[in-house]
């Protein structure tokens, strides 16, 4: 979405990654809420729905809000299960894996077919490869997500990954987020 620019003269020293992005171990999660209804929302949907997120094997279940995100992947003919924005409605506890997080991008499986799991793995691997080239890159954390309806019925279990927020990338590198304009419409690219 945006890039980081040279640090201001009073820049703080670089910070370590927050707990969620400090490891490459796969996290097993349960996201409960009307995810199935949200996924059917379409490209113009601005719906925000309540839900919960919990790390499997932990007693901590945190309240969240879920919304669709992305541009092309929100189109029904592209993805049946578009990427999600996960917003914590209260700050996660200090000892939590999600400590210090407020809003996260969750890259999802897009479609149920196994081929789409492989596409997602390739996209995740691209982020990890870029991390090897430069610290000025988004960290990603692979997750195995059990999606469950608000009533508790299983929807699907698929891999996905969280992306580090841009302001955390900047802070981790002793920089700040660059303020850039809106997207350029495709029609203006010639």
What label would you give each PLM region?
Residues 2-190:
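Phosphate/dinucleotide-binding and metal-coordinating scaffold of catalytic cores
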């Amino acid at each position: 979405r945006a890039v980081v620019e040279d640090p201001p003269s009073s820049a703080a020293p670089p910070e370590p990654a927050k707990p969620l992005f400090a490891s490459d171990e796969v996290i097993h999660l349960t996201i409960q809420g009307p995810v199935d209804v949200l996924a059917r929302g379409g490209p113009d949907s601005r719906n925000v729905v309540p839900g919960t997120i919990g790390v499997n094997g932990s007693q901590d279940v945190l309240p969240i809000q879920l919304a669709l995100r992305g541009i092309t992947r929100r189109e029904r003919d592209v993805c049946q299960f578009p990427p999600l924005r996960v917003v914590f409605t209260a700050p996660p506890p200090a000892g939590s894996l999600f400590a210090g997080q407020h809003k996260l991008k969750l890259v999802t499986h897009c479609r149920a077919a196994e081929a789409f799991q492989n596409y997602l793995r390739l996209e995740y691997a691209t982020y990890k490869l870029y991390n090897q080239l430069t610290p000025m890159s988004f960290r990603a954390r692979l997750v195995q997500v059990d999606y469950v309806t608000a009533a508790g019925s299983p929807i699907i279990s698929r891999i996905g990954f969280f992306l580090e927020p841009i302001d955390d990338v900047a802070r981790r590198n002793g920089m700040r987020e660059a303020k850039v304009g809106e997207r350029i419409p495709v029609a203006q690219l010639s």
